[in-house]
Amino acid sequence: FIPMGRPVPVPSGGSIARVSLSVWMRPKIWRLMEHEKFDVIHLHEPFASAVTLSALTFNYGDIPTKVGTYHTFNGSHLYKLFSSRILRRYSDLLHGQIAVSEPARAFISAHIPGDYKVIPNGIDVKKFSEASPFPRFSDGKTNILFLGRLEKRKGLKYLLAAYSDLKWEFPNTRLIVVGGGNLDAESMRILGERSPGDVILAGAVSEFDKCRYFASADIFCAPATGQESFGIVLLEAMASRTAIVASDIVGFSQVVHEGREALMFKSRNVQSLKESLVRLVNDKALRSRLGNSGRTRVEQYRWENIAAQLIDYYRILQTADSSKGLANVL
């Protein structure tokens, strides 16, 4: 890991991205490129920071193959601030462009027309599948897990409202909320007025403990309201063999299918969410079936498989010079 400036919090797509905006990093980056002579430079969101733009505009005698990956879906201000003409000037420096999903491809294509290869995100399946649950949550209660940053677009307030109703009918349930940030005013109001009980606010946790929370869950709920081009958190739940309840937003529908790996509810609809939760709380066999289906599907998202797709794409983009290898990738 080579530090490239102090990250600055920047609003992006309903979230906060931490990127380096220091133009003074360019000489350092160019010296690094010149010294290492990378065969491939792979940039994620290539126009989003001074670091990626500096790497994008660098070249030396035998120009390295430059690849950009786009994760953004609706909500990013970057593509509204700059015209397609300006963005195209920089995108033309890329030899290949990747989108992590069809929604991400559609979004970036609307701003920068071109050919995009869809290669999804991947995860380390093994570390989730082998994680051990926390003993304190193995007390017979049905554990419902929310995991994500406490941002409005993640939709936690809808889950809290649904759980508040559910808890009266099914007192042997527990809601575990994992993620950094602060609850919004509506979420605080729901907890204060309804006092549903058995709500665990775990805060931010380590990667190791995150796997254990998934292993402790009977149901994973992803109530996001939009601005998601993919759903890595769904992959993590599937790797943990956990039944999923997810909102029917476009990004999630690329990862799971209704009735196969997940029950999908109408986004922002508390009643629809509650009905899906009730089905799973009532039906252990259905939870098992969804969990097993998810565990099978997630195999295609193993990093080993995704990395193979990336290497194949790098090779396609390589020049006709057969002596040019792929030993050095940034």
Regions found by a protein language model. Name each.
Residues 204-205, 212-217:
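Short alpha-helical donor nucleotide-sugar binding micro-motif in glycosyltransferases
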Residues 136-164, 176:
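Conserved donor-binding/catalytic core segment of Leloir-type glycosyltransferases
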